[in-house]
Amino acid sequence: MFKNTFQSGFLSILYSIGSKPLQIWDKKVRNGHIKRITDNDIQSLVLEVEGTNVSTTYITCPADPKKTLGIKLPFLVMIIKNLKKYFTFEVQVLDDKNVRRRFRASNYQSTTRVKPFICTMPMRLDDGWNQIQFNLSDFTRRAYGTNYIETLRVQIHANCRIRRVYFSDRLYSEDELPAEFKLYLPVQNKAK
């Protein structure tokens, strides 16, 4: 999808405020919902993915199962709200051995397991909004001893709220981020 696109800096694949946030995504829902709501903490539109079973409610990008993202930027960043329920996401990458590898992170696992085609790992989320930064190049090297070439697919499962999902060429400090990539929490007035 993005193979022939010049890639530097930031490349966003989901922005909850956009006119069609799921334009390039496919949705699967069973015993749950995927809808845009206003989050009270940030007073802004977000995408809520909720379901009784994490494996049957998710969004996946690209929408066409035969297509791939072709994103070469090595950092995946997701701005996600912890709903204090089971949550998992999965990223499929291509390495320099031309092998498709999957990384699955979840908040209900306690150990990391590396198998030939999938690496599952635990993830700890803070209360409220989180910025998940995933160094795909580093994970590919540490898990498989190979080099990251590109990201093929991203799949985000229940249960979470999503503000933005993007790729970047490196990790940026809060000051370096463009305004629309920051998560603004409203200032609380502390009345006495």
From Swiss-Prot:
Its main location: nucleus. GO terms for cellular component: axonemal microtubule; centriole; ciliary basal body; cilium; motile cilium; nucleus. InterPro entries: CFA20/CFAP20DC (IPR040441), CFA20_dom (IPR007714). The keyword Cytoplasm applies. Signal peptide: none annotated. GO terms for biological process: cilium assembly; determination of heart left/right asymmetry; notochord morphogenesis; positive regulation of cell motility; positive regulation of feeding behavior; protein polyglutamylation; regulation of cilium beat frequency involved in ciliary motility; regulation of heart looping. Disruption phenotype: Display curved body axis, short somite length and defective heart-looping orientation. It is found in: Nucleus; Cytoplasm, Cytoskeleton, Microtubule organizing center, Centrosome, Centriole; Cytoplasm, Cytoskeleton, Cilium basal body; Cytoplasm, Cytoskeleton, Cilium axoneme. Keywords: Cell projection, Cilium, Cytoplasm, Cytoskeleton, Microtubule, Nucleus. Cilium- and flagellum-specific protein that plays a role in axonemal structure organization and motility. Microtubule inner protein (MIP) part of the dynein-decorated doublet microtubules (DMTs) in cilia axoneme, which is required for motile cilia beating. Involved in the regulation of the size and morphology of cilia. Required for axonemal microtubules polyglutamylation. Plays a role in cilia stability. Belongs to the CFAP20 family. This is Cilia- and flagella-associated protein 20. It comes from Danio rerio (Zebrafish).
